Amino acid sequence: MAMAAAASLLPACAAPTLPGRAFRPRRNSTPTASLSCDGGSRGRGVGLGVILGGGRAQGVRRNAAAETYVPGSGKYIAPDYLVKKVTAKELEELVRGERKVPLIVDFYATWCGPCVLMAQDIEMLAVEYENNALFVKVDTDDEYELARDMQVRGLPTLYFFSPDQSKDALRTEGLIPIDMIRNIIDNEL
């Protein structure tokens, strides 16, 4: 009875995803207000995973009907979005190649709650800056070596590359407001 009462106090996004299954909070977790996922912990007891009651943020897949399951991988692939997922080789070509617009790279993981939240903002910015910036994303689970080489320690991590290759890239880590991303694109690059 106490478990049902505790589950009713959780936000709607923390409700059980399977019918008939009771919500069971993790015993060894300590609630945290962090909005980033530590890259080395794979979501165990960090950030929204703890707040939402488990190692993985529950309810991450917003529209399961629109996604395709990849057998054997345990992953769902979303339909095409404006922000293209790139490989290490493709990213290297984009960074080293000549661009007339800034390049924004989102390092994310499918199990990272803050990454899912930021992905929505990144998609909106891709529409807003359609001809004035290029947005791409890198799945750190698929491109582990690249993430390590780029020193991605927490998720989400954004890199901002100026079209002027003499300027250093800017980096942010964790969930940041959409206005801060706009400010970096408009004023820093």
From Swiss-Prot:
GO CC entries: chloroplast; thylakoid
InterPro entries in alphabetical order: CITRX, Thioredoxin-like_sf, Thioredoxin_CS, Thioredoxin_domain
Domain (Thioredoxin) ranges: 72-189
Active site: C112, C115
Metal-binding recorded as keyword: no
Localization, UniProt: Plastid, Chloroplast
GO biological process: cell redox homeostasis; plastid organization
SUPFAM superfamilies: Thioredoxin-like
Cystine pairings recorded for this chain: C112-C115
Enzyme class: oxidoreductase
Any matching Pfam family: Thioredoxin
Transit peptide: 1-36
Site feature Contributes to redox potential value, where: G113, P114
Site (Deprotonates C-terminal active site Cys): D106
Enzyme nomenclature, EC number: 1.8.-.-
Record flagged with keyword Flavoprotein: no
Alphabetic keyword roster: Chloroplast, Disulfide bond, Electron transport, Oxidoreductase, Plastid, Redox-active center, Transit peptide, Transport
Molecular function as annotated in GO: protein-disulfide reductase [NAD(P)H] activity
Function description: Probable thiol-disulfide oxidoreductase that may play a role in proper chloroplast development.
Family, similarity comment: Belongs to the thioredoxin family. Plant CITRX-type subfamily.
Protein name: Thioredoxin-like protein CITRX, chloroplastic
Lineage, uppermost ranks: Eukaryota, Viridiplantae, Streptophyta, Embryophyta, Tracheophyta
